[in-house]
C-alpha cells in the first residue's frame, strides 16, 4: 500500500457532477500540484484544477488527512463537472503524475487493512451500492454500521473469556483457580451454541434479502405462466403465443414485492417431449424449480382434468396452486379444483391473468408471503455463504467442546480456541495475543 491510487467514484457517462478520488502518501502533493494549495482537512473549497498551466476544470476539492479518512490514509476528492472529457482530463493528469489506477474495491480494501472497517462492514459497503430495495438498503446499512460485527465480536469475546480461564488452568495448575473450570464454563458455552444455531437458521433469510427471493412459475404448456409473469412485472418480459412449448429457457425477471427483491422465473411447460431443445428446457425448469424458495403451479382451470405427473414431480407441500383462466369455468368447476389442490397441502390462488388487473390476487398474496418469509428476524442476518460456513464451523467446535467437558481441560480449551478463530474469520480480525492479555488481567498469576 505504498503507492498512491486514483479512480472515478461515480459512474461512467455524462452527469452534472463526477467525483474522482485519490488515496496514498502522495495525495497532499497531488492536490497542491493540481489545485495550487492544500485546503484545510475535511473542508470543501472551490479551486481551478490545472496541468502544466492549462486549466482542466473548476472543481470542489476536499482533502482528508489520514487516519481521519475513509481509507485511513491521506486522501482527496475532486468534484468536477460530469462531462466525459472533463473526467478524462483529470484522470490523465493523475496518471501523468505517476499515480496508479485503483483495482476494483481497492479503496475499501485499504480501509479494511488500516482498521477502518472489518470484513462484514466492507461487504456492507458493496451491498449498499448494489441495493435495489428498501429491505436491502436497511440490511446493508446495518451491516456497514457494524450490526453483524458487534454480534460476532461479542460472541468471540465470550469465547476468549472462557478460553482465558481454561488456558490458565492448563498453564498454571498450582495457582488458586476455581475448581473444574470446564464445568463452570459449560452454561455459557451452551447458551452461545444455541445462539449461533439460531443465527444459522436466520442466515438463509439474510441471503434471500440480499440476493432475492426465488419464485418459479411451473406447470403444463399453455397454462398461462408467461401471461402471469408479464402481468406481474407489468411488461412483455416473456413471449406469449397459443402454441404450446413457446418458452424453452428460463426467463428470470426481478420484481419488488413488499419492499423485498424477488426473482420471478418463467419456465418451460412440463411435459414429455421428443424435441431435444424443449426437453432441455424442461430439465432446466425442473432444476430451477427445485432450488426456488416458492413454486407457483399455474393451472389452466378449463383444461386440467387428470393427475399430471410431470407437473406434480416438482411441487412440494406448502407451494401454491394458481388456478388461472377462472373466467372460462363455472363456480362448480372452480370449487372442485379448489378442493383438489387444498387437499394436497397447496395454497390456492384464483385469477384470470389475461384480464386487466387479473394478476392482482397473486401480487397481493405474494407480497404478504414474501414479507412474512423475510422480515422479523431476531438477529442481524448473515448475508453471505462464508458467514454461514464459519458459523457452522464455530458451532461444531462448540458442540465438541461441550462433549469434552469432564475429560481433559486441554481438549475443551483447544475446541474453544478453534471456535473463536472461526468467528474471527468472519470479521477478518484474528488476534491470538488477546487470550494472553485476558489471562494476565483476570488472574493474579505468580503472586
Curated annotation (Swiss-Prot):
The keyword tRNA processing applies. It is found in: Cytoplasm. It comes from the Bacteria. Gene3D superfamilies: P-loop containing nucleotide triphosphate hydrolases, Probable tRNA modification gtpase trme, domain 1, tRNA modification GTPase MnmE domain 2. Its cofactor is K(+). The keyword Hydrolase applies. One of its GO terms (cellular component) is cytoplasm. Its EC number is 3.6.-.-. Residues 212-371 form the TrmE-type G domain. Keywords: Cytoplasm, GTP-binding, Hydrolase, Magnesium, Metal-binding, Nucleotide-binding, Potassium, tRNA processing. (6S)-5-formyl-5,6,7,8-tetrahydrofolate binds at residues 21, 77, 116, 447. Its main location: cytoplasm. One of its GO terms (molecular function) is GTP binding. Mg(2+) binds at residues 226, 247. It holds the Pfam family MnmE_helical. GO terms for biological process: tRNA methylation; tRNA wobble uridine modification. InterPro entries: G_TrmE, GTP-bd, GTP-bd_TrmE_N, GTPase_MnmE, MnmE_dom2, MnmE_helical, P-loop_NTPase, Small_GTP-bd. GTP binds at residues 222-227, 241-247, 266-269. Binds 1 potassium ion per subunit. Belongs to the TRAFAC class TrmE-Era-EngA-EngB-Septin-like GTPase superfamily. TrmE GTPase family. Homodimer. Heterotetramer of two MnmE and two MnmG subunits. HAMAP family: GTPase_MnmE. Exhibits a very high intrinsic GTPase hydrolysis rate. Involved in the addition of a carboxymethylaminomethyl (cmnm) group at the wobble position (U34) of certain tRNAs, forming tRNA-cmnm(5)s(2)U34. This is tRNA modification GTPase MnmE. It comes from Caulobacter sp. (strain K31). The gene is mnmE.
Amino acid at each position: 500500500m505504498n503507492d498512491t491510487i486514483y479512480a472515478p467514484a461515480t459512474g461512467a457517462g455524462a452527469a452534472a457532477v463526477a467525483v474522482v478520488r485519490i488515496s496514498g502518501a502522495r495525495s497532499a502533493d497531488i492536490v497542491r500540484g493540481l489545485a495550487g494549495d492544500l485546503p484545510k482537512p475535511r473542508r470543501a473549497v472551490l479551486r481551478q484544477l490545472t496541468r502544466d498551466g492549462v486549466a482542466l476544470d473548476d472543481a470542489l476539492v476536499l482533502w482528508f488527512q489520514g487516519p481521519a479518512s475513509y481509507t485511513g490514509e491521506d486522501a482527496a476528492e475532486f468534484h468536477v463537472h460530469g462531462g466525459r472529457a472533463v473526467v478524462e482530463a483529470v484522470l490523465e493528469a493523475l496518471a501523468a503524475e505517476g499515480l496508479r489506477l485503483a483495482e476494483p474495491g481497492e479503496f475499501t480494501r485499504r480501509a479494511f487493512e488500516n482498521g477502518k472497517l472489518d470484513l462484514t462492514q466492507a461487504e456492507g459497503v458493496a451491498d449498499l451500492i448494489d441495493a435495489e430495495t428498501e429491505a436491502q438498503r436497511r440490511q446493508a446499512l446495518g451491516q456497514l454500521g457494524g450490526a453483524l460485527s458487534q454480534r460476532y465480536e461479542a460472541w468471540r469475546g465470550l469465547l476468549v473469556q472462557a478460553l482465558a480461564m481454561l488456558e490458565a488452568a492448563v498453564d498454571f495448575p498450582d495457582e488458586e483457580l476455581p475448581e473444574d473450570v470446564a464445568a463452570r464454563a459449560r452454561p455459557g458455552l451452551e447458551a452461545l451454541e444455541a445462539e449461533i444455531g439460531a443465527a444459522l437458521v436466520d442466515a438463509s433469510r439474510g441471503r434471500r434479502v440480499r440476493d432475492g427471493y426465488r419464485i418459479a412459475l411451473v406447470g403444463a404448456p399453455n397454462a398461462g405462466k408467461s401471461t402471469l409473469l408479464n402481468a406481474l412485472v407489468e411488461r412483455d418480459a416473456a413471449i406469449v403465443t397459443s402454441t404450446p412449448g413457446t418458452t424453452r429457457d428460463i426467463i428470470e425477471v426481478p420484481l419488488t414485492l413488499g419492499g423485498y427483491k424477488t426473482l420471478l422465473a418463467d419456465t418451460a411447460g412440463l411435459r414429455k417431449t421428443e424435441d431435444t431443445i424443449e426437453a432441455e428446457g424442461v430439465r432446466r425448469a425442473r432444476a430451477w424449480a427445485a432450488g426456488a424458495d416458492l413454486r407457483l403451479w399455474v393451472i389452466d382451470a378449463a383444461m386440467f382434468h387428470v393427475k399430471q405427473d410431470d407437473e406434480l414431480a416438482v411441487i412440494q407441500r406448502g407451494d401454491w396452486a394458481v388456478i388461472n383462466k377462472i373466467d372460462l369455468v363455472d363456480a362448480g368447476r372452480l370449487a372442485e379444483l379448489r378442493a383438489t389442490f387444498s387437499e394436497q397441502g397447496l395454497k390456492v390462488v384464483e385469477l384470470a391473468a389475461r384480464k386487466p388487473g387479473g394478476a392482482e390476487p397473486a401480487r397481493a398474496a405474494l407480497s404478504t408471503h414474501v414479507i412474512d418469509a423475510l422480515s422479523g428476524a431476531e438477529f442481524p442476518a448473515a448475508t453471505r455463504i462464508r458467514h454461514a460456513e464459519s458459523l457452522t464451523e464455530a458451532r461444531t467446535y462448540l458442540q465438541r467442546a461441550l462433549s469434552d467437558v469432564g475429560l481433559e481441560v486441554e481438549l475443551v480449551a483447544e475446541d474453544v480456541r478453534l471456535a473463536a478463530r472461526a468467528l474471527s474469520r468472519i470479521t477478518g480480525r484474528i488476534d491470538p495475543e488477546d487470550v494472553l492479555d485476558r489471562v494476565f488481567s483476570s488472574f493474579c498469576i505468580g503472586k
